[in-house]
Design a protein with these regions (language model features):
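Conserved C-terminal beta-signal and adjacent last beta-strands/turns
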Residues: 2, 497, 540, 605, ...
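N-terminal periplasmic "start-of-domain" segments of outer-membrane beta-barrel proteins
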Residues: 50-81, 106-109, 115-118, 171
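N-terminal periplasmic accessory domains that precede
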Residues: 86-89, 106-109, 146, 158-180, ...
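Extracytoplasmic beta-strand/coil segments of soluble accessory domains associated
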Residues: 87-125
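Short acidic/polar hinge/loop motifs at secondary-structure boundaries
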Residues: 98, 109, 125-150
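Outer-membrane beta-barrel signature, preferentially recognizing the C-terminal barrel domain
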Residues: 301, 305-309, 424-431, 501-557, ...
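Surface-exposed extracellular loop regions of Gram-negative outer-membrane beta-barrel proteins
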Residues: 336, 459, 471, 485-541, ...
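Gram-negative outer-membrane beta-barrel transporters
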Residues: 444, 449, 555-569, 582-670
């Protein structure tokens, strides 16, 4: 087995800012599912959060010039390290972290918060349930926008912030490019390809992007369960060997057509097709040396999963008199999910077959949407826009679980297991409507103000075969204010301030009282069940920042933020009347989160005239939070990442471009409730890349990921009147080598 060692701590000197501000509270609407969230307005054209007078287009910088704070990562930065997974790109962005072990997916977090606090959009909209961000290839992305403070044009379900991933669109010249790559490490092999084609013929332009990948893995995840009574005496020790192998195949297709008419109007058709197939074979063997044994120490799993997603939009932009513009968009989406899971149980590996279990899940998503925005200069110095966002979404799910105990264990040391047989169906519908108005006012050449208000209303209806029907109707008003002031007698110094009202609505899985069972049920391996009484969370936020720009590509910024959250949701664990442990979401009072961030990036030539072509970048984020209903210390909100940092360097020498990035995030213990606890190890990632240009049409990109090969350790614990139980697992780190040949033709 392994030893649990505390990682070394990193000492960082940073500027500490703190704000203490009051909070507001208001009922906010529940949401049906991640895929049915409020849809944002189009993102293809410039939004009104831009200063109206910017000078030459070549000098425009969204980070510097937009009144509403936003960080934009362009396509060249996205593909720099040769990543095949968009999550690996996001973890290098300032103030963004991805939880979990490197290369195993994870949750995207801003300000150290995930679980719905960070809003993730694709082309301004949330994808439906079943769509995996892991399947989105970086080559298909045009840009990534990190929006720290909410704006009225997007849904305000963004307490921590919004990350908007904008897919590629047509360009003005013909282009054909093929990329063929291979990535591999211990037990992992990932071949992939990307084809991009675009051209223009008269008033019509088109583009087509195709990405494909074939990922295979073979890995172990060992774990240990320990228990102690109130006197500290060991009452449980169980070691588990978990082995799994399988793969994931996927393809993404993105066609786009654009017509430009003589009067300047445009009509755009854009679609996105995603298909993926996952397969996994796994086995686990539990060896108990102290305490009670589980019902079935040896288990075999086989899982297959297929998901399909198709979205299409038609966007018409009409230019009107006096600089006004009308932007209309309609869209439709369909998706399907097929999941099959087989589970066989034994007392010992190779022994008598005791339990046979099969779970069949089927799901479909469909919906349509409509958005519109009218924008006009209105008065001198003002950029006003009003708009709407409406739609309908439907989710149908069926789940059948059939279990048969073939033989009961003869040994009385093994607890009795009751086979579970269920046949469940549910249908969820959501009808939504949002309206907003926003204005950006250039008060003076140095001072601009953004003000907006958004109303969102949502009606939900959920029906199921094993729970009572439920309906809800709710709405929320979100007033928003942001301002940018460029300090006098300076060329590049400016300050920002923002006040936002945002919220977090529960998703459909959190609301439906349908139970998902575990085989060896315990406080650290509970069943899961939704809570129909769950309420949304509402937050009042304040952001402030100082920025200094002193040359092309050179800047430094310091920012601070605070969020006061009412109706905080945590995961509780209860013992049901049938004797099984159940985890379910519950509202538990208020919570507060504060944070400071520091970012700097600059070419070395900006401070040393004759320096080589080296670009440097660094960012640090420190977060604090507390949940009022949970006694400290370590009563952090949503397992918040306390500290994260990234250091990077890029160097160009002739035909060679190379660089490296080092990321660090702390972990540590978290008190979820007076009885529950969680621990995660600190995480260190070192990545390197090199790009060699053979000629203008051919180049080779090589990258190394997770060079330090650090293991990821996580632990959960539950304390009762009889003592404490802990479960600790290790995800081994793997160094990944990537090579991609890029060819234009």
């Amino acid at each position: 087995m392994y030893l649990h060692r505390a990682p070394r701590r990193l000492t960082i000197m940073s500027i500490a800012l703190s704000l203490a501000l009051p909070a507001l509270a208001q009922q906010a609407p529940p949401s049906l599912a991640a895929g049915a969230a409020v849809k944002a307005a189009p993102v293809d054209d410039k939004t009104i959060q831009k200063v109206e007078v910017k000078g030459a287009a070549s000098s425009y910088d969204a980070r510097r010039d937009d009144t509403a704070s936003k960080i934009v990562l362009n396509h060249d930065e996205i593909i720099k390290y040769g990543d095949t997974n968009v999550l690996d790109v996001l973890k290098r962005l300032p103030g963004v972290t991805v939880s979990g072990a490197s290369g195993r997916g994870g949750e995207i977090r801003m300000r150290g918060l995930g679980s719905g606090y960070t809003q993730i959009l694709v082309n301004g909209e949330r994808a439906p349930a079943g769509f995996s961000m892991d399947s989105l290839a970086p080559d298909s992305i045009e840009r990534i926008e990190v929006i720290r403070a909410a704006t009225a044009e997007y849904s305000t379900q963004s307490i921590a912030g919004t990350i908007n991933i904008v897919l590629k669109k047509a360009i003005t010249k013909a282009q054909r490019e093929l990329k063929v790559g291979m990535a591999g490490g211990k037990g992992i092999i990932n071949p992939n390809y990307n084809l991009q084609m675009s051209d223009r013929k008269g008033q019509l332009s088109y583009s087509l992007t195709v990405n494909g990948f074939h990922n295979r893995f073979d890995r172990d995840t060992p774990s240990v369960d320990e228990g102690y009574d109130v006197a500290g005496k060991p009452v449980l020790y169980r070691a588990t060997v978990f082995q799994e192998k399988g793969g994931y195949d996927g393809v993404n297709i993105g066609p786009r057509l654009n017509w430009t008419f003589a009067n300047g109007d445009t009509l755009t058709s854009q679609s996105f097709i995603n298909a993926g197939r996952f397969k996994r074979d796994a086995q686990s063997d539990e060896m108990t040396s102290i305490g009670a044994r589980p019902p079935y120490p040896s288990l075999d799993w086989k899982v297959t999963n297929e998901n399909y997603f198709f979205r299409t939009d038609l966007n018409w932009v009409k230019k009107l008199e006096a600089g006004a513009k009308l932007d209309l968009k309609i869209g439709g989406v369909i998706g399907a999910l097929r999941n099959d899971s087989w589970r066989d149980a034994y007392l010992v590996r190779g022994g008598r077959h005791l339990l046979d279990s099969y779970v069949k899940t089927r799901g479909t998503d469909k919906g349509y949407s409509s958005t519109g925005k009218y924008s006009t200069p209105l008065f001198e110095g003002h950029a006003l826009s009003v708009g709407w966002d409406g739609g309908y979404s439907q989710r149908d799910d069926s789940r059948k679980q059939n279990e048969a105990e073939l033989f009961a264990p003869d040994d009385k040391l093994y607890p009795t297991y009751r086979p579970i047989n269920v046949n469940e169906d549910y249908k969820g519908e959501i009808t939504r409507l949002a309206a907003y108005a926003q204005d950006e006012w250039n008060v003076t050449p140095r001072w601009s103000v953004y003000a907006g208000v958004r109303w969102e209303g949502i009606n939900t209806a959920v029906r199921g075969s094993d729970f009572a029907d439920s309906k809800s109707r709710s709405s929320v008003w979100s007033p928003l204010l942001q301002t940018l002031y460029k300090l006098p007698d300076t060329k590049g110094d400016q300050v920002r301030f923002a006040i936002t009202r945002t919220y977090k609505a529960p998703n459909v899985q959190q609301l439906i009282p349908r139970r998902f069972t575990s085989t060896n049920n315990s406080p650290t391996e509970p069943d899961y069940q939704g809570n129909p009484a769950l309420k949304p969370e509402l937050a009042l936020g304040f952001d402030a920042s100082y920025e200094h720009y002193w040359g092309e590509g050179a800047m430094v910024s310091v920012s601070a933020s605070i969020r006061k959250i009412d109706g905080y949701t945590r995961q509780g664990i209860v013992l049901a009347p049938d004797g099984r442990w159940i985890q379910l979401p519950v509202n538990d009072g208020t919570a507060t989160t504060r944070g400071v961030e520091f970012e700097a990036k600059f070419p070395l030539k900006s401070i040393m005239k004759n320096a080589p072509a080296i670009d440097l970048r660094a960012n640090f984020a420190r977060n604090w939070s507390s949940v009022d209903a949970v006694e400290g210390p370590n009563n952090r909100l949503d397992q918040q990442t306390p500290f994260s940092s990234t250091l990077g360097v890029d160097y160009k020498l002739g035909q060679l471009i190379t660089g490296a990035s080092y990321s660090f995030r702390t972990g540590g213990p978290v008190r979820v409730s007076d009885r529950q606890g969680i621990y995660q190890s600190a995480r260190r990632d070192l990545e390197m890349y090199a790009l060699w240009k053979f000629d203008p049409k051919n180049q080779l990109r090589v990258g190394l990921n997770n060079v330090l090969a650090q293991d990821f350790i996580s632990e959960s614990s539950y304390r009762s009147d009889n003592g404490i139980v802990k479960s600790r697992s290790v995800s081994p780190g793997v160094v990944m080598l990537r090579a991609t040949m890029e060819m234009k033709f």
